[in-house]
Amino acid sequence: MATPASAPDTRALVADFVGYKLRQKGYVCGAGPGEGPAADPLHQAMRAAGDEFETRFRRTFSDLAAQLHVTPGSAQQRFTQVSDELFQGGPNWGRLVAFFVFGAALCAESVNKEMEPLVGQVQEWMVAYLETQLADWIHSSGGWAEFTALYGDGALEEARRLREGNWASVRTVLTGAVALGALVTVGAFFASK
């Protein structure tokens, strides 16, 4: 279970991430959480992980919030159903990022459907879910410090560079093999003439 000291941290993390995502979509103007660069390394890490998640799973995850047909009367039930389904196989950091992205998408859909009061409620549900359903797992997995170590301080960019570097090496080898094969074929052709 979460300690009382973690509650403001969780609330601030949720508010920062949701505000950041709403601003990305052009829904929020003015000062508030999520505006500008995040000073807190945890907030920076969650923003980067959320952006990476959306980039990788845009097709799969896009329009999920719209497909739920959320109304003020059904929003909490839908939120809980999707969250429970998301963690059905057990929590991990990737699913936790998906949870944040889903919550922010639900907030954006609420603004889009002119149900702005739901934004604050969804954030409260996110905080409550984190503190009641996921706090023990987060704590036993190294806490938010472990998340920040895994996803913060450019770790995602470095992993992407390594992945792209590995694929670039594979592409180079394959291209070289194809070119060598073509040269051998051309050489054999001219040798037979």
Curated annotation (Swiss-Prot):
Gene3D superfamilies: Blc2-like. It is a peripheral membrane protein. A motif (BH1) lies at residues 85-104. One of its GO terms (molecular function) is identical protein binding. InterPro entries: Apop_reg_BclW, Bcl-2-like_sf, Bcl-2_BH1-3, Bcl-2_fam, Bcl2-like, Bcl2_BH1_motif_CS, Bcl2_BH2_motif_CS, Bcl2_BH4. Promotes cell survival. Blocks dexamethasone-induced apoptosis. Mediates survival of postmitotic Sertoli cells by suppressing death-promoting activity of BAX. Belongs to the Bcl-2 family. The BH4 motif seems to be involved in the anti-apoptotic function. The BH1 and BH2 motifs form a hydrophobic groove which acts as a docking site for the BH3 domain of some pro-apoptotic proteins. The C-terminal residues of BCL2L2 fold into the BH3-binding cleft and modulate pro-survival activity by regulating ligand access. When BH3 domain-containing proteins bind, they displace the C-terminus, allowing its insertion into the membrane and neutralizing the pro-survival activity of BCL2L2. Interacts with HIF3A (via C-terminus domain). Interacts with BOP. This is Bcl-2-like protein 2. It comes from Homo sapiens.
